[in-house]
């Protein structure tokens, strides 16, 4: 291809795509993930996967739009996509665009099986963390069938905890913890539930009506899990999932929130088209961090790369891509000239040289040895 097609051609192509093309893009993402991990010599035998759903508000008559949980735009139709991210690398592993309905138990089970089929070959142990929408027997059974550990926020289950088993791990805190094995109606076996209870704050300066029952004096957070260990440590591990909200918000700002057509199948494919671009920028940041490590043994200055691993994708683009330059023709050659007064120019040149050196080396994913690849292709 000599040049990129015009925008209208691109959008006509997107409009012709469907759900099958979207699923094929998930396979492309899986292949790319293994290649990048091999290239960067990453090995994660144990990973944490955080799952979350979000809302994309619709302002037209797009297919699949439903009225549902939409706190910002109550009463409006929307889509309700589900996304899963790997906490260690903050990359997208699986997800799909859905109609704007609450996800069902069977859908959660199918999604967990989908995650299982997308794991890199080096991963042996997985911890799933999800909110109350995944607290169903179908999801629990699927997680156990896949060999995953899980911590799901409770929704709809009302286990009865031993009143004598409450404990405080921190003496300066009034928060108490407990656990109990409970078999909700409709489940085939009991599950472990862990809970924390927080005393409700009393309004000062007003008459206080004492609660008759002890349970009414507390706010409860209950979780279903198959992990062993103290309840407070399990809940603390679940709370680390909060970062997935930032990842979902970042993906939406990168283009996920755009609804390009009125056809659900085309919007489904566009969803999976945006997420590889999101992951590629994640990989560019990982490569930038590696180039910074390599530069420590050379005289190259990459001070502008400092902290780029923790930057958002928008800030990473400002550092690595949005740099003023001039394109000139000289001796029948096209050249790109950067300003010597821009502090980011040396790091950009160093990073491009680092990428060229990596391209000229043997492909790490084609070499024998190391961990087995699940998505190796010729």
Task: Give the residues covered by each predicted segment.
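Short, conserved catalytic/metal-binding motifs centered on acidic residues
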Residues: 1-2, 6, 10, 45-56, ...
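Short acidic, glycine/serine/threonine-rich loops at helix termini
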Residues: 59-65, 93-97, 107, 137-143, ...
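An anionic, glycine-rich sequence signature occurring as long contiguous blocks
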Residues: 149-255, 259, 350-378
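A short, flexible helix-boundary coil/loop motif
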Residues: 281-378
């Amino acid at each position: 291809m000599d040049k990129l097609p015009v925008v209208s051609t691109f959008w006509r192509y997107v409009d012709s795509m469907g759900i099958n093309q979207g699923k094929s893009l998930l396979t492309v993402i899986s292949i790319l993930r293994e290649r990048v991990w091999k290239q960067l010599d990453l090995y994660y035998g144990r990973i944490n996967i955080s799952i979350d759903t979000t809302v994309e508000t619709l302002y037209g008559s797009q297919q699949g739009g439903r009225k549902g949980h939409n706190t910002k735009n109550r009463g409006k139709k929307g889509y309700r996509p589900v996304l899963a991210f790997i906490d260690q690398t903050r990359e997208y592993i699986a997800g799909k665009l859905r109609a704007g309905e609450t996800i069902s138990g069977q859908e959660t089970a199918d999604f967990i099986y989908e995650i299982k089929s997308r794991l890199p070959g080096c991963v042996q142990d997985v911890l799933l963390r999800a909110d109350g929408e995944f607290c169903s027997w179908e999801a629990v059974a699927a997680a156990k069938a896949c060999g995953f550990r899980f911590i799901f926020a409770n929704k709809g289950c009302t286990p009865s905890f031993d009143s004598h088993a409450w404990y405080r791990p921190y003496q300066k805190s009034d928060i108490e913890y407990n656990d109990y094995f409970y078999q909700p109606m409709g489940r085939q076996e009991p599950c472990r539930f862990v809970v924390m209870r927080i005393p409700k704050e009393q309004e000062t300066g007003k008459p206080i009506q004492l609660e008759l029952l002890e349970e009414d004096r507390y706010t409860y957070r209950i979780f279903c899990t198959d992990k062993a260990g103290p309840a407070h440590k399990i809940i603390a591990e679940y709370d680390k999932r909060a970062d997935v909200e930032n990842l979902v918000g970042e993906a939406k700002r990168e283009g996920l929130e755009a609804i390009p057509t009125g056809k659900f199948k085309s919007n489904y494919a566009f969803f999976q088209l945006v997420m590889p671009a999101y992951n590629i920028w994640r990989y560019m940041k990982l490569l930038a961090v590696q180039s910074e490590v390599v530069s420590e043994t050379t005289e190259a200055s990459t001070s502008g790369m400092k902290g780029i691993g923790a930057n958002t994708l928008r800030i990473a683009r400002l550092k690595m891509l949005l740099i003023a330059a001039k394109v000139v023709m000289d001796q029948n050659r096209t050249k790109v000239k950067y300003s010597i007064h821009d502090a980011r120019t040396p790091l950009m040149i160093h990073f491009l040289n680092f990428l060229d050196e990596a391209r000229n080396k043997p492909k790490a994913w084609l070499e024998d040895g190391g961990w087995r690849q699940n998505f190796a292709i010729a």
